[in-house]
A protein has these predicted regions:
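A conserved structural motif in NAD(P)-dependent oxidoreductases
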Residues: 223-234, 245
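Alpha-helical segment proximal to the catalytic Tyr-Lys
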Residues: 142, 186-187, 247
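Residue(s) in the substrate-gating loop at a strand-loop-helix junction
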Residues: 157
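Substrate-binding pocket helix/loop in short-chain dehydrogenase/reductase
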Residues: 113-114, 118-126, 208, 219
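Short, small/polar-rich loop/turn modules that mediate ligand/substrate recognition or access, typified
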Residues: 189, 194, 249-251, 257
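Active-site helix of classical SDR
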Residues: 137, 173, 181
Length: 263
């Protein structure tokens, strides 16, 4: 009798393992997901067991190299164009399945002091960094509501929290992303959808590492932990927020800046 009971337990565990192994993986879409912080997020999600798609709008060769190195599916469109987002999302879902996790990471800068900034510089940043979050989230939202599950994670910035001289366009857009998350979180909560924001500080991306050493040292001197952040540290925040363990967290802002700006 004991042997049979023990055998049943082994069979039951085997069945559970089989079911777990044959479950459909959750699908994650990362905008701007082939470079810098976005690439780290895409790779971390893939390593976490998600099926990942990454969008880009720029260097084809770099994106293809990223895809070849990681096996992550890549798609090219501009998040600033709503119709392109609708068509792109449809293609991703046809290829991979319905999107469960959306990481709005794509962003650009067009820095200028306000007395010199052009409307074009203002509009380009707002269209990508703020309107792009709407353009990507809106076509996915109803599907998440219907399935009663979703994770929307918006990558903002320390400069969306404190502002930055010479970045009135960028700061306004990134601040808008925070407000977007807080408002939409209230609409999604009862449907099992969480909406959160991550505000990175200065991260050791190629762009930051390319600035003159004297400038970089000046930046680091303002960071209490005494170093730049790593893209992988932002990616780990995303992994947590995307997980089932973060289901009680919504409308929140994770500040990851080494203590440079404490809210």
């Amino acid at each position: 009798m004991y042997w049979w009971g023990n055998g049943c337990r082994h069979v039951f565990r085997a069945i559970l393992t089989f079911i777990e192994g044959t479950k459909m993986k959750r699908i994650a879409l990362v905008t701007g997901g082939t470079r810098g912080i976005g690439a780290a997020i895409s790779s971390a999600l893939q390593h976490g067991g998600y099926t990942v798609a990454a969008t880009y709008f720029g260097d084809d060769e770099a994106a293809k190299n990223f895809s070849c190195d990681t096996g992550i599916s890549i798609y090219k469109w501009s998040v600033s164009d709503y119709d392109s987002c609708v068509m792109g999302i449809k293609k991703v879902e046809e290829d991979l399945g319905t999107i469960d996790i959306l990481v709005n990471n794509a962003g650009i800068t067009r820095d200028a002091m306000f007395h010199k900034i052009t409307f074009s510089q203002w509009k380009e940043v707002i269209d990508t960094n703020l309107n792009g979050v709407f353009n990507m989230t809106h076509p996915i939202w109803n599907g998440m509501r219907d399935r009663k599950f979703g994770r929307v994670i918006n990558i903002s910035s320390i400069n969306g929290q404190k502002g930055q001289m010479g970045q009135v366009n960028y700061s306004a857009a990134k601040s808008g992303d925070i407000g977007f998350s807080k408002a939409l979180a209230q609409e999604g909560a009862f449907k099992g959808i969480t909406v959160n924001t991550i505000c990175p500080g200065y991260i050791a991306t190629d762009m930051v590492k390319a600035v003159p050493e004297k400038v970089r040292d000046a930046i680091i001197s303002q960071i209490p932990v005494g170093r730049l952040g790593e893209a992988s540290e932002i990616a780990r925040c995303v992994i947590f927020l995307a997980s089932d363990q973060a289901g009680f967290i919504t409308g929140s802002t994770i500040t990851a800046n080494g203590g440079q700006y404490i809210v």
